[in-house]
Amino acid sequence: MSNPPHGGVLKDLIARDLPRHAELEAEAETLPALLLSERQLCDLELILNGGFSPLEGFMNQEDYNDVVKENRLASGLLFSMPITLDVSEETISELGLKAGARITLRDFRDDRNLAILTVDDVYKPDKALEAKEVFGGDEEHPAVKFLYETAKEYYVGGKLEAVNKLQHYDFVDLRYSPAEIRTHFDKLGWSRVVAFQTRNPMHRAHRELTVRAARSHHANVLIHPVVGLTKPGDIDHFTRVRVYKALLPRYPNGMAVLGLLPLAMRMGGPREAIWHAIIRKNHGATHFIVGRDHAGPGKNSKGVDFYGPYDAQYAVEKYRDELGIEVVPFQMMTYLPDSDEYAPVDQIPKGVRTLNISGTELRARLRSGREIPEWFSYPEVVKVLRESHPPRSQQGFTVLFTGYPNSGKDQIARALQVTLNQQGGRSVSLFLGENIRHELSSELGYNREDRDKNIARIAFVASELTRSGAAVIAAPIAPFEKARQNARELVEKYGDFYLVHVATPLEYCEKTDKRGIYAKARAGEIENFTGVNDPYETPAKPDLVVDCEKQSVRSIVHQIILLLESQGLLDRF
């Protein structure tokens, strides 16, 4: 018999509303519709299938306020994470959102009707309070950045009626709903289940940790990785799931099963650990492993941890009686080479020799093709990782030039393209400012909003080419720091990004202008001209600073080649 769900009843809205499917589908076609984002789809799926029980919809203002301030729903039941549907003021007006209104929620990928929302209320959240109480308030925290930069200004609360399941086309056999995994446990005869949350590949230490947890609690293991949204820069879920499948035979026969969780993580540390425990309880687990820095986003730009290493364990311990799932705290596992075994760090006697490979070191070994020892990971796991992580000389990268008009960006970019093409080994794509404006952004103007859109489009194309192993060279003006930083973050999901500030002085750019564009701008014939009547924000942290007044194009290209070579991106001779 699996663990009762949070609140006592599994809120499986898919099963509840299935008898009314035809009626709801017909009504959904007649209602105003809202296309959901990827994060909203993740939340919706886990509301509809009962993963977020006792929720039956997106939180209204009363529930939201109590969760933010007290870790509880208005009913008093423990719940630590706000589950909200954010909308803009424009959307409120377009869809007629008000109490009692009904709207269809659709999948942005295929326009499929997923649910009908009956609006309870529309409210403006206190984002500063949410950021502080739920995530700690650090503006560099990814969830706080999402609140301020991405989430719309209003939330809509209300109950849901399920119309259709979300369609998935990958690893369908592993995507158990809470009801399905509970049935699977019953079929296997499992009554005690330890759930293990992860957003990373698993290695020998993780296998040892989960087996120890199962052994000490006389339980079986549910490997329950997140395949929704995780931390930017994480290894993609396709690779990770192949790793988990490769690892599974290393468990004693019948000990472990693999199930995938379509969760949009918030990286919320202590609050998230409580939330994760509730979700695993809803999936029938009786025990839940909480490790060091559980669901933490790491460090901020000053090198300070967002959360303490064991804050998450303290949080779940505080609410253990209410959670209804036994939390299994675990220290980091470390390898002891002299005895060829793993042990928790707090159980290793002083003076005993230990070995460990950090995540940073593992990524470095994958990039360089260096050996990953068998004491750290299994050969079949390493094989999967190497398939998705070719050596540095085969990885894509982007070089983005920024500077005033006529600063020499285009000449440097063209020369760099020729140099890389001469070397060979990967395709090279060149995007010059005027070409991009003509081919990709012809309808955009030169105000700040349109300039940012132009850089965002360049970054999107560059990220896709980088992902496929190409070298991308882009030379827009890119005058604004935020747009440049957003471009870096997008491209770095898939490969290296190098910002080159072509810091040729404005006076020199104007003096050597043979096309007369500066003169026209000075005469008022060209509006929003960077350096004359529109600002240029000097890059805060460029990877390279060059100056065409003092340096030749050839010497600048050589500097860039040396930079790329030092990072292992070019073949060494």
Curated annotation (Swiss-Prot):
Pfam families: APS_kinase, ATP-sulfurylase, PUA_2. Its EC number is 2.7.7.4. One of its GO terms (biological process) is hydrogen sulfide biosynthetic process. 3'-phosphoadenylyl sulfate binds at residues 434-437, 451, 477-478, 515. GO terms for cellular component: cytoplasm. ATP binds at residues 197-200, 291-294, 333. It catalyses: sulfate + ATP + H(+) = adenosine 5'-phosphosulfate + diphosphate. Allosterically inhibited by 3'-phosphoadenosine 5'-phosphosulfate (PAPS). Signal peptide: none annotated. Sulfate binds at residues 197, 199, 295. Homohexamer. Dimer of trimers. Catalyzes the first intracellular reaction of sulfate assimilation, forming adenosine-5'-phosphosulfate (APS) from inorganic sulfate and ATP. Plays an important role in sulfate activation as a component of the biosynthesis pathway of sulfur-containing amino acids. This is Sulfate adenylyltransferase. It comes from Neurospora crassa (strain ATCC 24698 / 74-OR23-1A / CBS 708.71 / DSM 1257 / FGSC 987).
